[in-house]
Amino acid sequence: FTVFYVFYLAACNFTRTMPFKTLGDAYAGGTSRFVFQTSGSSAEAYLTRPAGLGPFPLMILLHGHTLGPIGAESVLSEAEAFASDLCYAALAVSLPGYGATEVPPGTDPKITLNVVLDAVSLVKRLPWIDSRRLYVYGFSRGAFFAALLANRLEEIEGTVLHSGAYDLNRVYQGNIWFRSMLNPTGEKNPKLISILPEVATWHAPTLILHGEEDFLVSVQQANLLSESL
């Protein structure tokens, strides 16, 4: 359920690296990069602050598969759009295996979820963040993890899922492109996750976006999710 990129839009604003402890004074209207400790290692994230005093709702952005050493940087344009157009703060996290995040990737989704949850826990402490109003946006690979977050953050008020896969068993059976990624050890009957059984318990509104002619991840995945809501 990956989407391959050759190009991505560069973020409009200048980005600077800051220690997390100084982000309480991050400049308004800008994006700051920070590294935080998680899962016995370190991970990279970007935080965009809107103009004004706040506190601001927080949009959590989870990126898709990228080529080269790019992670959360690939969704900074979207992060800055949320900040400038909607006055939402935006947190973009480089998932394990991407960007400067050093947490080793793996097939267990908890590895990625723990990194994201640790980043969110840190950012919620900032005085200009409204910790009671969280939103999550996930694209492709990121949409899968965004869907998993829906029941793991009580403060989520809305979810946007773009071009994701939500029943990995169906993806595995129907698309040979993803078999080596979903089953790297070559197990005969791999146990893969389906998010669909838990969807009925989601409490926040959900927007599902998917291209009808997507040749990598079938629009059937979006339809299955929609029918389960």
Q: What positions do the PLM features span?
A:
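N-terminal cap/lid segment of alpha/beta-hydrolase-fold proteins
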Residues: 17-53
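Active-site glycine-rich loops that stabilize anionic/oxyanionic intermediates
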Residues: 56, 63-68
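Mobile cap/lid helix-loop segments that gate and shape the active-site cleft of serine hydrolases
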Residues: 71, 164-198, 204
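Short amphipathic alpha-helix adjacent to the substrate-entry channel of hydrolases
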Residues: 73-91
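Alpha/beta-hydrolase active-site loop
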Residues: 107-126
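Alpha/beta-hydrolase fold nucleophile elbow
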Residues: 129-140
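Short beta-strand/loop motif that positions the catalytic acidic residue
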Residues: 202, 208-210, 214
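Conserved alpha/beta-hydrolase "acid-adjacent" motif
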Residues: 215-221
